[in-house]
């Protein structure tokens, strides 16, 4: 054949090398492989000559097209294997011949030959494993070609897209599906492949995967998942396989296979093949979720899954309903997706589901789809899948918004139509809602409640209830229900807020959702669904501003509100709620559990802010209870003839007392007594029946108080019980109000008519008036006796690693903070009126707003400190006097930046320890009028000998401030004298450590007593120049030559019932001229010339007499003289013997003289 020889001679070398790889035709061989040696040389050839790669791939492309046309399956197999070898040999050069690879694969796929299609899968998997995603994203034509190939493979796996002529039997169908799913698995196994095309690939393959997973059985997905995990566990380890000898011949017995399957019939084999095919589809879904773990891909995957579920439900007419089993096919599929999804991205599934929900209009013909989506969301929320990062409030508001849209009149007419302006949506009773809408509303309420299955942060339940309650609005045109309009009654804000609830149905649904939240949050759940952290209890402040719902025109709203409130009282209150929560006790309660350690400025500010927040919560609680009892008063008078309403009010009042104790009784008792007085002035057509109902409500409440506080054995309790029995015997008592409370459900379901009473006997009812004072006194005694049992006294809060002041509190002081304040007793005895209650509510509301809005609070600054909650009477001293009386414990809150309006700062002893933040403060403050005040605790309370040895050692009270006692954050700035610093020396020297923990109980009074013996500090000598100041350009007090500034003073002791300095053996007692610095101040020790007010005064005595006085200073001196003269006569005072500790302070601490 000379022409063939010439043709072979003229061929390029790369074609010759390719052709040599094809073996000779062998008849009967199922799998043809390329010649190994020729293939190896071809791979070496192209790897060393990159320019030959396009030529080799182009030649393979032509060769494959001819072989496919001629149905030469063996040559096609060799071509595909050559391509796989080329990709693995030069993976970096794949973009050079990637288009040819896809062209060859596409040519093979369009042949519709199952054998060639199956042979192409290995090459396609190799291509997907090594492809360059940058090229796939950059070249649009290449990306379209890649997508077309995957579309063809997906069509093989989709039964509807298979060619009719190729579908002959079930085994053949399963074979085509397996081929398509294997190719899909290869495509999704590459993480970059899913992220390259913006989600187009997911839109192609996910519906095919889910189509092969669906068979209509509810538990099918769960069983598939179990088999998948079992198969993964049983996969043998290739490294541990036995190595066979070269001469060993495998027999039929050693071949792999399933003997049990071999013994079955053809139908069982087909079922096994179909199950394997569905397992392959589940593995594809696993790869999609694991590799497509970006947030955008998870969002798209969720939407595609939900769209498939909705489409299947529409085609099969099998939507989910309230009667559907929770473990159905749709919920199992979405749970598998959520479990396989990365933990940090699971919350996106719920967000995507909410987006799908809002794309479904709330119309009658689309309610089934909305129900399915909400059902799946609810299943996810209550499942064991923990979605960390879920925005609970966003999901809650979304569900509430859809609920509001569902009950609005526009939803019944369509979204494009506008509701009639003449309609009053606030007064619908829900009877016009279809059954589908009612079922959907029930599901929405259940879904909102299931949001609390997992607790993701402490205040989650509190925030959820607050978000719902603040969006419940009164209907348009409704008159205000009380003189106090809550903040949420703003009509313009309500119209702009789509989640506002105006209609009756919306309010009822929201209140029932609150009930579900409380039930789920308090239910006992298994550990698998437990939250990541414990939650905080829901306080009564959450209900502030909702009292008007008790007066709503629609009874459904009133009943739902009372039901939710009763569940809150039952589930969220404990014994601690029986203890009084009042502003007068807030300071003591906060101080009792605070550690007095050396805290930083940030910690002090945080403690102050927490104190203000707790005060605001207490104000909100009392405000709500006051207005709630006011509303109960109005409802009782308006519905005095309706027995059901009176029974509900009695149940509510009794539950408040039983669960809140004195906190509810302080507002309920005056209101009930006022209601008793108004009973005689009722002007109704059924006045006598109203008197019976009101009288039963009043004495029923009094009996509840009597039983709650254990007063049934006292005279007042016996009087109440006797009156109740007398009224029962005369038939002037409401029988439903008994000694045991009814359930709310029984009251609502009771449809019996009102019983007739002996109205002629109403004049013989005895009012409870004479025993009120004794009744209140017994309540006070019972509270004072029982509260310590609920709240046993504990030791002061300790923090390991930080010094603790004291370790003991006198029992008397501990009990004083637990006693019922006199203001509460007076409140229960004072006459009650609506106007006074409204004024008190407005006043407390304004105070709460000022506490929340002010940075430092608005409470007045007191001239005393509370030590661990022992408390003391409110000081009436002036700011300057109170400042002197606290002896270094300033009540100013330390600010992070200097104030422009403050006066020059206090001084600090030169030798006291200086901290880094004080040095930073010196460098940051330039102007003298912007100096930052030093910590009030740097001042010396009283020095000790131990502090002389090492002045840099910290005192145990060096972090101690009045801001931690009071928390009001006020700031007292001392007056200056012609630009000079104040001369009281407050906070100038190092405090001494506490000598004995037993004296800590007297800390507050001891501070005030010791402050009276501290003389003012004189100005520094004129000759000393301090550039820049130290710190803050402040003056320093110099130690006297006779006694160092850190020498110890006398211990404090109790003298004649008052605190003072312990007298020595020769009866030397405290005098106002005696100071901590020794006799030098008393005898007028001479000091160098100093300048006062810019004038040189020369050498003078260093004592009180030589200091220039002002009117304010004279007032302070008079106060001190009055305090000292009342404790000890001046004639007993003798000067202290001079000490020989001169100069020791100069070498024991500090950082030396400035400048630095």
Curated annotation (Swiss-Prot):
The lineage of its organism: Eukaryota, Fungi, Dikarya, Ascomycota, Pezizomycotina. This is Protein efr3. Coiled coil: none annotated. Residues 869-894, 1032-1055, 1125-1145 have a biased composition (Polar residues). Residues 908-921 have a biased composition (Basic and acidic residues). Residues 412-431, 786-805, 840-990, 1020-1057, 1125-1156 are annotated as: Disordered. GO terms for cellular component: plasma membrane. Residues 944-964, 1022-1031 have a biased composition (Low complexity). Belongs to the EFR3 family. It comes from the Eukaryota.
